[in-house]
Amino acid sequence: MKMKIAIVTACPSGVANSIIAAGLLQQASKTLGWEAYIECHSTVIAGHTLSEEEINKADLVILAANGKIDMQRFVGKKVYQSPITACTSDPVGYLKQAAEQATELSSEQATRCDSPATASVSAKKIVAITACPTGVAHTFMAAEALEAEATRQGHQIKVETRGSVGAKNQLTEQEIAAADLVIIAADIDVPLDRFNGKKLYKTSTGLTLKKTAQELSNAFAQAKTFSSSANSATNEKAEEKKGVYKHLMTGVSHMLPVVVAGGLIIALSFVFGIEAFKEEGTLAAALMQIGGGSAFALMIPVLAGYIAFSIADRPGLAPGLIGGMLASSTGAGFLGGIVAGFLAGYSAKFIADKVQLPQSMAALKPILIIPFIASLFTGLVMIYVVGGPMSSIMSGMTSFLNNMGSTNAILLGIVLGAMMCFDLGGPVNKAAYTFGVGLLASQTYAPMAAIMAAGMVPALGMGLATFIAKDKFEAGEREAGKASFVLGLCFISEGAIPFAAKDPMRVIPACMVGGAVTGALSMLFGAKLMAPHGGLFVLLIPNAISPVLLYLVAIAVGTAITGFGYAMLKKSAQAKAVAA
């Protein structure tokens, strides 16, 4: 029996998008052999309004619209809604997706969509900031998700991204002043002073990306007026419970560029020979001095400094840097740097909150008193309490990692590989990544190699799965698979998130098995990686990865396991027929 569909297209101007979408969907319905009744909201052509008879005949109602649509007439029908732009790239695939994902519209849902409260919400102006530790994938994917969902609901939105290249699409004072709502989707510390007096909602990039509609709804319901100087103790305690991870990730995000630059410059020095840097006055020696003697020397102080900065703002930076330098000089390594950062940050915050000075001396507090007392406290604790034990732990860990047998190496590779694929850029993934980056300062390069190789597997595997099992994926998913494969080559695990969000019970296990195998093989082959990011493009730097061929084999094997594994696990009932 021929499928009958009712289609409504609408865009704010009622000119181009609405007419183009109507034409594309009409042609696509003919291609599929479906009968379509189309209502095109336009300001330049006389539009047809769906009759009651046409709506009753329709098996499915599709609303490709940016704006408010009268929903009451569709109560009891299977309805699919999307932004108008979603239907233009692949209209046939869009119609198939609509047929699969449409849900019955209840009277309550229709009333909610048409109510004055909802109409007022649809006119809201939103400003947002997204930021993640590495500033590569989650930052921009979360921004795109927010923009798409807000546009779908009829809101005006502007998102400032704080990525690895700095702040882009920056919010102006006028835009902030005009905003009805501020959304902060960040996994690191973001300055909020400019949002004083605004309704503000905080969330993570992961939740924003995976549950965009829910988080947008939560933002309207749970946003509270922000005041940088008058936050309640309850709010501060609630923030602090989830703040430790955010403080750590702030330190890691600022440390990463230093480590990447240093690691690649060290790798360049090896072009002239593995031990060429020992000859003074040579270019190799200069490169080693820049990368190893300077960049890597700054790694732990920067980590500790920005952990403290995240906790106590600028007054925490100096004691954090000093504590980090002491951690480095005492051999406490990155673990000592983490401890130093939290010591410095919380001691500086305690002094700022508890020490009260006369108004005439208040200006001395952030410049003199806090840095002096917090640095003294942090330094003494690092030297007399923390330094020794942490140094012993780091020495033991480094010695174990450098001298462990193949069995232990494989086990470590399995654990690190599985962790990298467990939550695709989440806390477990970042814990494994931070562990590998921290060991670079101790000239331990094998775990970092296993971590990056395993981290590439999920996105590469999903790309492979969409290629070898095309009939099980709709057109949009196949396009996402191509993008995922490219992201995987760049060591951006988040390319697999769209697949994991739809089918987590199959995607995550397939990724973890592939990642664990890749991590194990990388450790077994003795692969070493000098830089903690860049994916296969690091191969352009001689000696940045060794041995290259075996490293590529490890990645290829894990990718094949994940790709073929997911292709087999994906239920045939989920298959998307290519033909109508």
UniProtKB/Swiss-Prot annotation:
Topology class, membrane: Multi-pass membrane protein
Every PTS EIIB type-2 domain range: 3-100, 124-221
Domain notes from UniProt: The PTS EIIB type-2 domain is phosphorylated by phospho-EIIA on a cysteinyl residue. Then, it transfers the phosphoryl group to the sugar substrate concomitantly with the sugar uptake processed by the PTS EIIC type-2 domain.
Keywords recorded for this protein, A-Z: Cell inner membrane, Cell membrane, Kinase, Membrane, Phosphoprotein, Phosphotransferase system, Repeat, Sugar transport, Transferase, Transmembrane, Transmembrane helix, Transport
Natural source organism: Vibrio cholerae serotype O1 (strain ATCC 39315 / El Tor Inaba N16961)
Transmembrane segments: 254-274, 292-312, 322-342, 367-387, 408-428, 448-468, 480-500, 507-527, 537-557
Outcome of gene disruption: Does not affect growth on fructose or on glucose.
One Gene Ontology CC term in the entry: plasma membrane
Protein name: PTS system fructose-specific EIIB'BC component
Major enzyme class: transferase
